[in-house]
């Protein structure tokens, strides 16, 4: 119980992300007692399991599919929280989409980009592979299905849709689980965005 209180204290004083990081440190600490390591491992696993449930929420796939089918003229970049979920998003709207992430071969990724750029598909689904140094001038809608505690990735995703073209606007839709950690993250993330109008 004493050890569990230690994690509750960390969570309250440092924030959940820091408590999670401290749990990882204890698991690696050679001087930590077996009880401390066990509690840290349980805490770490529970956070990961909760995140997986949120990341793979089936309602996100249903909402994503509805959005894609309701916007046939849009050029859409979609972002999932994990490679497997990104593939599930892409598979839900085949043949309109292809996935692009680190588990794909260079040949597969190149083919997906070419299909998107030449208009064969109008949806490109990614995880983090498109976050930095990548631009898709024709994209005009973003659907974000995976939220993280870091706002930078969201800023990069939004910026990719609207930058470099004067007068161009991008529409970004964020699918998140209500009353979850995702809702807190999205609200914190949008505070850091400038020249972007958001409705939550």
Tell where the protein language model's regions lie, with residue ranges.
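Long, largely alpha-helical accessory region at the distal end of helicase-like NTP-driven motors
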Residues: 198-200
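Conserved helicase ATPase core of P-loop NTP-dependent helicases/translocases
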Residues: 75-80, 84-134, 153-155
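Interdomain helical connector at the RecA1-RecA2 junction of SF1/SF2 helicase-like NTPases
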Residues: 1-71
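A short beta-strand element within the Helicase C-terminal
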Residues: 123-125, 132-148, 153-156, 163, ...
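Conserved segment of the helicase C-terminal RecA-like domain
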Residues: 160-192
């Amino acid at each position: 119980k004493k050890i569990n209180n230690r994690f509750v204290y960390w969570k309250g004083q440092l924030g959940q992300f820091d408590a999670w990081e401290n749990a990882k440190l204890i698991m690696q600490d050679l001087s930590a007692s077996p009880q401390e390591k066990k509690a840290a491992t349980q805490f770490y696993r529970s956070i990961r399991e909760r995140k997986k449930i949120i990341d793979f929420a089936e309602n996100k796939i249903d909402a994503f599919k509805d959005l894609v089918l309701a916007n046939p003229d849009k050029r859409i970049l979609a972002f999932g929280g994990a490679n497997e979920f990104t593939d599930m998003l892409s598979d839900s709207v085949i043949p309109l989409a292809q996935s692009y992430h680190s588990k794909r071969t260079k040949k597969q990724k190149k083919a997906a980009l070419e299909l998107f750029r030449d208009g064969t598909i109008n949806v490109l689904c990614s995880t983090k592979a498109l976050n930095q140094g990548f631009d898709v001038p024709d994209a005009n809608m973003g659907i974000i299905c995976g939220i993280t505690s870091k706002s930078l990735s969201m800023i990069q995703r939004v910026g990719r849709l609207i930058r470099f073209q004067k007068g161009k606007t991008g529409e970004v839709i964020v699918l998140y689980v209500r009353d979850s950690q995702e809702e807190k993250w999205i609200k914190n993330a949008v505070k850091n965005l400038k020249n972007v109008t958001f409705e939550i």
